[in-house]
């Protein structure tokens, strides 16, 4: 590679007036590019271009701190590409799918190229054509990047790696930090540049973690473009929903007609609030923002004026979960109301369940929420906390590694350890910025023994090796695919796994939630009609399969989806994901298996085309699927509503979202033996989600 470009080379990102050809395609810049450049060239991140390029020239590791609205998520990757003479490849990780897609779309506009060419993206279930060899900058979720590292620990595809929103401390981010530290300290990629970015980050702690790597810190102007007026409560509020709604109504009555954002904890809260607002204030466009929301609805939330196409509105009101805290940009906001809460989950290793609870956000999160305004004009932030409560918030969120199940994360680490052993995996786990709890490690070891994930020498078995190729799934779903392959029902199992993943315990997630986007007959009655028609007496897993099969055999799938209010984008993503799982499990298990595994897999080394076809679908599919579910969910089994693998004496109930409630009375269900995909504690009560009766 020739000498790297500097701030003096006014091409590409450093050519906002578009005076020279675009180095990505050697074509003249469009007028749209020049108009947009008048905006992004004023961002604080652009003003720091010379410092960023100089840091990349002189250091292998660069920390960038900056508040939201600085433009770092879009401009820093372009500066990194500029540093490589537009010949290298830059990858940037982001924590959420919706944010990854938004960043890629805006980045393509800023680069004046078609999305999927020089600018690409990848997340679980995304269009595979968007991530290709033509990409110069790729936006990926943390999980996708972890898989890249597992496949190629040298990260040989990339010249610059950028980690955004590092302060969130998700398990995937902690793994990435460990992997990057291991790679940088090894000296095997002296040419690789790494940038770690965050709005709020403890740079001393991070630099200490990378203590043997030469690094520097760049602080990009932390102040908003415009002043933000901040308000706190005089006394603690008893209901942030009630207090927030009253504040919103007061602002509406003042006839200011400026856009507002209210941070709440769940999509259901967002829907509830918008349903309260719409009838009373028909000139206020209320829109819900949450993870995996409908992409059409999302554009009306993000754009400053696009919602005006939908009706005679004066202002926009956004009800959002914490997905709107960071990289997701909502244009035109003047008011932000922060409830001060988020919905948090933590793993209970005694019963392999999740405890869901509302808790205060960290100060870092609260400041990010405040930073949603003050970008294009002066803003106002209302924290529904007293000043004393605000000052008492934890500085940063608790790392997920201390709160979540680490089963699949340990499998990934074993896979990239030098000799791929359990002992080495544990040793690497203890090198994380915050090592996991011993109780979580013990719970994981118990599952490894139960399902023969590692052998007597601590080496990954065939089961463990296959699991590394599905590491974004929980272990029970991976095992279900493996056992379904053995029992000749892999295609149906792939559909069930994809449906379970996307619906997240609620079959209602397949249907439109909001009445602002439905094309036609999206009433709740239509959804109920479909469920009544297709519901399966075994429960959720088989009902999911039946719904998909009904969709698949329809001659006009779009009309079918519209008729029942089904989200076509969701079921199309399910179909694409199911196909990926199906062909991946076929390709993995058609290879010769490792010898002497106790959890014997079919030896497919001499399979004929007829054998493979028979394994795709058998005559007794339902029985085989049920047996595969039993084998893969041994630790997620309950008898008389008591988890059988739990060390705690607990009793749960079937989630109200399960279709079983529409078939059986409570006293009938309580006598059954079930398997479930998730055990959750909500408001102190345990419930089973995504449930199938096995006897």
Curated annotation (Swiss-Prot):
Residues annotated to bind ATP: 66-73
Keyword terms: ATP-binding, Helicase, Hydrolase, Nucleotide-binding, Virion
Stored Pfam families: DEAD (PF00270), Helicase_C (PF00271)
Location of the Helicase C-terminal domain: 247-434
Main subcellular location of this protein, as a coarse class: virion
GO-annotated molecular function: ATP binding; ATP hydrolysis activity; RNA binding; RNA helicase activity
Top-level taxon: Viruses
EC number: 3.6.4.13
Reaction catalyzed: ATP + H2O = ADP + phosphate + H(+)
Gene Ontology CC: virion component
Broad enzyme group: hydrolase
Motif stretch (DEAH box): 164-167
Homology family: Belongs to the DEAD box helicase family. DEAH subfamily.
The name this protein goes by in its record: Putative ATP-dependent RNA helicase L540
Protein source organism: Acanthamoeba polyphaga mimivirus (APMV)
């Amino acid at each position: 590679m020739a000498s790297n470009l500097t701030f003096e080379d006014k091409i590409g990102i450093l050519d906002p007036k578009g005076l020279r050809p675009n180095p990505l395609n050697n074509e003249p810049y469009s007028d749209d590019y020049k108009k947009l450049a008048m905006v992004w060239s004023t961002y604080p991140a652009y003003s720091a271009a010379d410092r960023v390029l100089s840091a990349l020239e002189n250091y292998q590791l660069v920390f960038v701190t900056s508040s939201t609205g600085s433009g770092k998520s879009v401009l820093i990757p372009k500066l990194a590409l500029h540093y490589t003479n537009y010949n290298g490849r830059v990858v940037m990780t982001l924590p959420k799918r919706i944010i990854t897609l938004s960043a890629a779309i805006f980045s393509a506009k800023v680069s004046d190229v078609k999305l999927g060419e020089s600018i690409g993206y990848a997340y679980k279930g995304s269009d595979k054509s968007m991530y290709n060899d033509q990409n110069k900058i790729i936006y990926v979720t943390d999980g996708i990047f972890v898989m890249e590292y597992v496949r190629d620990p040298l990260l040989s595809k990339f010249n610059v790696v950028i980690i955004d929103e590092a302060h969130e401390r998700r398990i995937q981010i902690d793994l990435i930090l460990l992997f990057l530290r291991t790679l940088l300290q090894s000296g095997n990629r002296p040419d690789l540049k790494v940038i770690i970015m965050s709005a709020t980050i403890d740079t001393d702690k991070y630099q200490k973690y990378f203590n043997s790597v030469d690094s520097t810190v760049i602080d990009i102007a932390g102040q908003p473009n415009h002043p933000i007026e901040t308000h706190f409560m005089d006394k603690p509020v008893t209901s942030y929903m009630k207090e927030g709604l009253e504040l919103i109504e007061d602002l509406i009555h003042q006839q200011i007609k400026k856009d507002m954002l209210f941070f709440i904890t769940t999509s259901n809260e967002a829907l509830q609030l918008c349903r309260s607002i719409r009838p009373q204030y028909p000139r206020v466009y209320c829109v819900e923002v949450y993870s995996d929301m409908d992409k059409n609805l999302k554009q009306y939330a993000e754009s400053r004026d696009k919602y005006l196409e939908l009706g005679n509105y004066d202002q926009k009101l956004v009800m959002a979960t914490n997905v709107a805290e960071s990289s997701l940009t909502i244009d035109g906001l003047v008011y932000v109301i922060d409830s001060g809460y988020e919905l948090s989950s933590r793993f209970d290793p005694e019963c392999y369940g999740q405890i869901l609870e509302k808790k205060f956000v960290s100060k870092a999160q609260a400041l990010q929420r405040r930073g949603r305004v003050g970008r294009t004009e002066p803003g106002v932030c209302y924290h529904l906390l007293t000043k004393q409560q605000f000052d008492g918030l934890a500085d940063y969120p608790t790392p997920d590694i201390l709160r979540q199940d680490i089963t699949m994360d340990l499998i990934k680490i074993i896979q990239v350890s030098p000799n791929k052993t359990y002992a080495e995996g544990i040793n690497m786990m203890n090198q994380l910025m915050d090592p996991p709890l011993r109780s979580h490690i013990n719970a994981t070891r118990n599952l490894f023994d139960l399902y023969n994930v590692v052998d007597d020498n601590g080496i990954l078995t065939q089961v463990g090796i296959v699991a590394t190729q599905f590491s974004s799934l929980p272990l029970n779903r991976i095992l279900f695919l493996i056992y379904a392959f053995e029992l000749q029902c892999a295609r149906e199992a792939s559909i069930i796994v994809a449906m379970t993943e996307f619906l997240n315990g609620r079959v209602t997630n397949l249907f439109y939630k909001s009445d602002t986007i439905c094309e036609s007959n999206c009433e709740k009655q239509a959804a109920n009609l479909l469920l009544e028609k297709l519901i399966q007496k075994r429960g959720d897993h088989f009902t999911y399969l039946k719904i998909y099969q009904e969709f698949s055999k329809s001659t006009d799938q779009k009309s079918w989806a519209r008729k029942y209010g089904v989200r076509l984008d969701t079921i199309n993503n399910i179909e694409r994901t199911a196909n990926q799982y199906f062909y991946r499990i076929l390709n993995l298990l058609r290879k010769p298996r490792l010898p002497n595994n106790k959890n014997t897999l079919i030896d497919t080394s001499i399979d004929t085309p007829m054998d493979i076809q028979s394994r795709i679908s058998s005559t007794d599919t339902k029985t085989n699927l049920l047996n595969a579910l039993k084998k893969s969910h041994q630790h997620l089994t309950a008898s008389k509503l008591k988890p059988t693998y739990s060390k705690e004496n607990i009793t749960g109930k079937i989630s109200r979202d399960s279709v079983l409630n529409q078939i059986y009375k409570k006293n009938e269900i309580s006598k059954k033996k079930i398997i479930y995909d998730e055990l959750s504690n909500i408001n102190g009560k345990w419930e089973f989600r995504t449930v199938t009766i096995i006897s």
